[in-house]
Amino acid sequence: MTNEQLRHRPDSRTPQDSSPSQGGGDHLLFLAEALRTFRDTGALAPSGTALVNALVVPVTSRPDRPISVLEVGAGTGVVTRRLAQVLRPGDRLHVVEANPRFAERLREDPVLAARRPGVGLRLSACRVERLSEEPEEPGDPQEPGEPGERYDVIVSGLPFTNFTPAQVRDILDLYLRLLAPGGELTYFGYLGTTAARTLTSGPRRGARHREVVRLLRRFEAAYGLGERTVWRNLPPARAYLLRSPGGHEDWAPRRELTPHEERATA
């Protein structure tokens, strides 16, 4: 996967017979949960098709062998459904969603139920930080999630800027441990959120938001392959593609930024 592919690859279209969105019901559920628990939801509407396609680039431009994919923060399943459409027999998809209402919607999703034969699917209704504590459940022997599972691709929909810097670092470190050597990670952030957070939530939360953004920029400097701005999304967003060299590395030492770094990331 190259920077050029991520930045300039034309938006692919979802097949006409299966849209990433399941209609107004998903949007209403998403909005209701956003109003109830915005910190964990992080948006008022699911991602649009253009952003979904940017996030699944490592799967649509993939090696010719079975792959294992982890999706974290699936919401109502717009990315999950796209993954289910493009995965092939022998592939495995492990979906992690902490919101019980979203998890229940995913369990009943007809697109996921109609995935290709031979595509393993597992749903974990927990936070990704607690994934190792989840009890094993009987089911399809092709289901992913065995102890020590490492993934070729992780697609993260978590709203990092709603979390503390310590939480974000812990999650990113976990992603590095969960990725196979050379595995790829995608995530996204909305544009213009730093100024908006300062104006709407005050200077203290604005400072926390900026620190999380700086942490993400360090992570991208260490592992980033490219980024892509998606204007056809509400709100506009930027998708990031990263690759793990394998294993944990101290990519973001715990220290204060220099004045030059502070200006560069504000």
Kindly give the residue locations of the regions a language model identified.
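A short glycine-rich, Lys/Arg-flanked "PGG" loop and its adjoining helix->strand segment in the class I
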Residues: 169-181
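Conserved class I S-adenosyl-L-methionine
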Residues: 66-75
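Class I S-adenosyl-L-methionine
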Residues: 206-266
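Glycine-rich SAM-binding Motif I of class I
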Residues: 77-81
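Conserved SAM/SAH-binding beta-strand->alpha-helix loop
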Residues: 99
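S-adenosyl-L-methionine
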Residues: 105-143
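Conserved beta-strand signature within the Rossmann-like core of class I S-adenosyl-L-methionine
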Residues: 181-191
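Class I SAM-dependent methyltransferase Rossmann-like catalytic core
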Residues: 24-63
